[in-house]
Amino acid sequence: MSSIPISQEGYRLMKKELENLKKQRPEVSEAIRLAREEGDLRENGGYHAARERQGMMEARINFIEGRIARYNVIDMKALGGEKISFGATVELEDVESGEKKRYTLLGPDETGFCKGSVSILSPVGLALLGKTPGDDVVIMVPRGRVEYEILSIEFNGPAIDVTE
């Protein structure tokens, strides 16, 4: 089983999601119990909805617990260097159109928390890893092949875009 890189903030948010899901267990169990009391389960929409919710919730809990066991928590403040790696914020310019893009490379489980991030395991992330400013990189995207020039690399940590 290979490890999965994640920032300290991403790890904290995943642990918080797990904690919140576990807190919902009694509520879902109570909804199932109350629906059972209504009688015939074959035509009991409330019962089936509560069981479905319970199944999805337990699947997500199992997924997160499995991932947490594999996480390699990375201190974003300790990152740096001249080459693109986990935690780098990269500015790119489309060689053809001149359009500029900015991405932060993070682990696959935290890109949803961080606006402007891509997974290091995505086609974009994999194409950028190990490159330096001035390098050109070809990335396959849904619209085809796009060539970018790497303009700059920064290691400032992710801008987690979440409200708590």
What are these regions (language model features)?
Residues 5-10, 64-66, 102:
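Short amphipathic alpha-helical segments, especially helix-boundary/capping motifs
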Residues 13-14, 20-21, 53-59, 68-70, ...:
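Generic detector of short, locally flexible boundary/turn motifs and exposed helical patches
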Residues 1-6, 71, 116, 121:
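Short, exposed beta-strand "edge-strand" segments with a Pro/Gly-rich flavor and a Y/T-containing core
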Residues 17, 21-24, 31, 35, ...:
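Conserved, well-folded catalytic cores of nucleic-acid-processing
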Residues 1-59, 161-164:
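N-terminal cationic and glycine-rich segments that engage phosphates or anionic surfaces
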Residues 74-157:
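Non-DNA-binding regulatory cores of transcription-related proteins
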